C-alpha cells in the first residue's frame, strides 16, 4: 500500500532551529523521498511513495515524460533560492527494488557569503539505491559567492545490482561581475559504497588562500568544477571508448574507471561548457546503463 505523506520530518536539530542571528544561528531543513516499483496492469510503474519535509525544502509532483512505465522525474524545490550562514539542509532519497527515478532542480543553487560571524552552512545528501533500481541525480549547478563558508557531504549507498549516474557542478565566484572567489572555504566530501564496500572516497577543500587552489598540481585556478559518476555499466571498456570517441577533445576533461566507478572530471571556467559536456556524457552512458535513451527534463527548457 502506498503511503504518501507531506507531514514535516522531526529532527533532533529542530529545537535549535530558529530566529537567531548570532554566532549560534541555525536553520534546519530536510526532505525525505522514497520511490518504489508497483504493478499497474501488465507493467511496472515507479511511484513516489514517501515525501516528507521539514522547513523550506519541497518537491513537485512526479512527471512521466518517458511514459507511464518509464523513469519517474521529480523536481526538488528550495524556495529561498540559496544557502546562507547557519542553514543546515538534509536530503534523503531511497529507491527500492526495480524503481527508476530522475531527480533534478529548476535552477542553480547559490551559496551566499558568510555573515559577519563567519557562521558556516551545511548540505548533506544521502542517496540509497536497492537492487535492480536506477537513480539519476542531475541537479543544476551550484554557485558559490565570494566569502561563502560551508560543507557539502554526498553519501551514495548502492546495493549489489543497483545502478546510478549523477553529477555535481560547482561554480566559484562571479567572474562575469569581476567578483572572484577570493575568500571563504568550501569543503566537499564524497562517499560511494556498493554492497557495503567503499568504491569512491574523496575530500577536497576549496580554499582560495591555499597554494593548491591556483597551483598546476591542484585546481589550477579553475572557477568551474564538475564530476560525473556512473556505477552499474555492464561493459565499462566500451563506455570509456564511446566517451573518448564521441566527446570533443579538450584539456578540461578526463575519464577514468576504477573499482567499478566511471568518473568524468571537468576543470575549467565555463558553466555552459561543462553543462554541454555532461549532457553529452549522459546521452552516451544512459542507454548503456539503463537501455533507454536520455530525455531532457522539461524544467531545463523553461
Swiss-Prot record:
One of its GO terms (cellular component) is cytoplasm. It is found in: Cytoplasm. Keywords: Chaperone, Cytoplasm, Nickel insertion. One of its GO terms (molecular function) is nickel cation binding. Pfam families: UreD. InterPro entries: UreD. It comes from the Bacteria. UreD, UreF and UreG form a complex that acts as a GTP-hydrolysis-dependent molecular chaperone, activating the urease apoprotein by helping to assemble the nickel containing metallocenter of UreC. The UreE protein probably delivers the nickel. Belongs to the UreD family. Required for maturation of urease via the functional incorporation of the urease nickel metallocenter. This is Urease accessory protein UreD. It comes from Pseudoalteromonas translucida (strain TAC 125). The lineage of its organism: Bacteria, Pseudomonadati, Pseudomonadota, Gammaproteobacteria, Alteromonadales.
Amino acid at each position: 500500500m502506498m503511503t504518501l505523506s507531506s507531514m514535516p520530518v522531526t529532527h533532533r536539530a529542530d529545537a535549535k532551529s530558529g530566529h537567531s542571528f548570532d554566532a549560534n544561528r541555525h536553520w534546519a531543513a530536510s526532505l525525505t523521498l522514497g520511490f518504489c516499483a508497483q504493478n499497474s496492469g501488465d507493467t511496472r510503474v515507479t511511484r513516489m511513495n514517501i515525501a516528507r519535509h521539514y522547513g523550506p525544502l519541497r518537491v513537485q509532483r512526479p512527471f512521466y515524460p518517458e511514459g507511464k512505465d518509464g523513469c519517474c522525474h521529480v523536481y526538488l524545490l528550495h524556495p529561498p533560492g540559496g544557502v546562507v550562514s547557519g542553514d543546515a539542509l538534509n536530503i534523503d532519497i531511497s529507491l527500492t527494488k526495480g524503481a527508476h527515478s530522475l531527480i533534478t532542480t529548476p535552477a542553480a543553487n547559490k551559496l551566499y557569503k558568510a555573515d559577519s560571524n563567519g557562521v558556516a552552512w551545511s548540505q548533506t545528501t544521502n542517496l540509497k539505491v536497492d537492487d535492480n533500481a536506477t537513480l539519476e541525480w542531475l541537479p543544476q549547478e551550484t554557485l558559490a559567492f565570494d566569502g561563502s563558508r560551508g560543507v557539502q557531504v554526498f553519501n551514495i549507498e548502492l546495493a549489489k545490482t543497483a545502478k546510478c549516474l549523477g553529477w555535481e557542478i560547482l561554480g566559484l565566484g562571479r567572474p562575469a561581475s569581476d567578483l572572484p572567489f577570493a575568500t571563504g572555504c568550501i569543503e566537499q566530501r564524497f562517499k560511494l559504497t556498493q554492497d557495503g564496500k567503499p568504491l569512491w572516497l574523496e575530500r577536497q577543500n576549496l580554499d582560495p588562500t591555499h597554494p593548491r587552489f591556483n597551483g598546476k598540481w591542484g585546481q589550477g585556478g579553475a572557477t568551474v568544477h564538475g564530476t560525473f559518476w556512473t556505477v552499474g555499466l555492464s561493459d565499462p571498456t566500451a563506455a570509456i571508448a564511446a566517451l573518448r570517441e564521441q566527446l570533443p577533445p579538450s584539456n578540461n576533461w578526463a575519464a577514468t574507471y576504477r573499482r567499478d566507478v566511471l568518473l568524468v572530471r571537468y576543470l575549467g571556467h565555463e558553466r555552459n561548457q561543462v553543462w554541454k559536456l555532461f549532457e553529452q556524457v549522459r546521452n552516451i552512458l544512459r542507454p548503456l546503463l539503463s537501455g533507454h535513451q536520455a530525455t531532457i527534463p522539461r524544467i531545463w527548457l523553461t
